[in-house]
């Protein structure tokens, strides 16, 4: 493997950092990792046994001292390499979680010879020690940042190695096919049978296409989605926004044109972090301010992941006065379903912001529209880096299916290189730094 110089530097140092979030809490953790971790813990911790004399996987209760000054009481957890998170000797000190206590405990570890860890350096060391591959390291960050159950579940799958295993299955098929091609090219006089490569390459292509199709759901589940509420004045946009939120966020009146500027509100829908955008009603108007709001609404629809087009089901149906961007993904709603229907449309969902009728079905429809056909029980691609490597691998496999053996072999080598980059087995010098740059100190 190839690593960036900045990733390799200082790997023999013993590092320390606060591993819990800033602010006051019941418990705080200071993590120390490296060749002198247990020696440094000896200088900080006083109990019935020294950390350096304690087997791995044990914890001690005692006092934390800076020379003769008592800092706090707490626990010291001992992990011995290579059976630790980083693959090195690790001491984790658990104290009361006040900033003052954690600051003094961390300062004491630095006085005893530790260096302040860089962002993500503990997980970087786990990766370099072979405890994690690069997709699992990215999943660690995903778990730290997960704000919804879907994001948590996907990150947990990634950390378990589920994504790596999906990739490994494709890589094994490509490796076998490449070996057969190389045998044909290297020993034609031996009469090596021409193994049919069409079926395994088609299978690999299908697997990569399925994996690539999960990228949209992976991005949505981690970064969130924007939903624009679009419709004529008094179609019920603001009422629906309030109903989905469960509280009054947007002003609702019977007067057309009440909403002139857009309004945003966040919530979780179908396990996805969603930003709802309430927009101005679409109509032709001489009012300059309202006209600006209409133009803005159309622009917001073009930038949304999903557009909810609301039409008043209690009034004669009218087409929108403005066409939506052709790239918009649209979900049509027939609103005010609690009132007598002036029209019906099986392609539109019936909803009522007053009674709540249709809202559960709407939430399910939003989830289906955002997550598509991605199988919830399988690991998805969740980062742009992962998506790019799979896209490159797919391009090379598609090319290999149409080329003669010598050129097909080259394409398969490139596909395998892309998959190895995905898991971090063969990675460019700047990729590792780019991944770990997003981590916080202490992880």
Curated annotation (Swiss-Prot):
For this protein, what does the record note about how its cofactor is bound?
Answer: Binds 1 potassium ion per subunit.
The molecular function GO annotations come to: GTP binding; GTPase activity; metal ion binding
Q: Does the keyword Glycosyltransferase apply?
A: no
Alphabetically sorted, this entry's keywords are:
Cytoplasm, GTP-binding, Hydrolase, Magnesium, Metal-binding, Nucleotide-binding, Potassium, tRNA processing
Gene3D superfamilies in the cross-refs = P-loop containing nucleotide triphosphate hydrolases, Probable tRNA modification gtpase trme, domain 1, tRNA modification GTPase MnmE domain 2
Report residues binding K(+): 234, 253, 255, 258
One GO term under biological process is: tRNA wobble uridine modification
Which annotated residues bind GTP?
Answer: 234-239, 253-259, 278-281
- Residues the record lists as binding Mg(2+): 238, 259
What EC number(s) are associated with this protein in UniProt? 3.6.-.-
The cofactors required by this protein are:
K(+)
Instruction: Give a short account of what the protein does.
Output: Exhibits a very high intrinsic GTPase hydrolysis rate. Involved in the addition of a carboxymethylaminomethyl (cmnm) group at the wobble position (U34) of certain tRNAs, forming tRNA-cmnm(5)s(2)U34.
Please give the subunit comment from the record.
Homodimer. Heterotetramer of two MnmE and two MnmG subunits.
Family per similarity comment: Belongs to the TRAFAC class TrmE-Era-EngA-EngB-Septin-like GTPase superfamily. TrmE GTPase family.
**What protein name applies here?**
tRNA modification GTPase MnmE
| Naturally occurring in which organism (per UniProt) | Deinococcus radiodurans (strain ATCC 13939 / DSM 20539 / JCM 16871 / CCUG 27074 / LMG 4051 / NBRC 15346 / NCIMB 9279 / VKM B-1422 / R1)
**Gene from which the chain derives:** mnmE
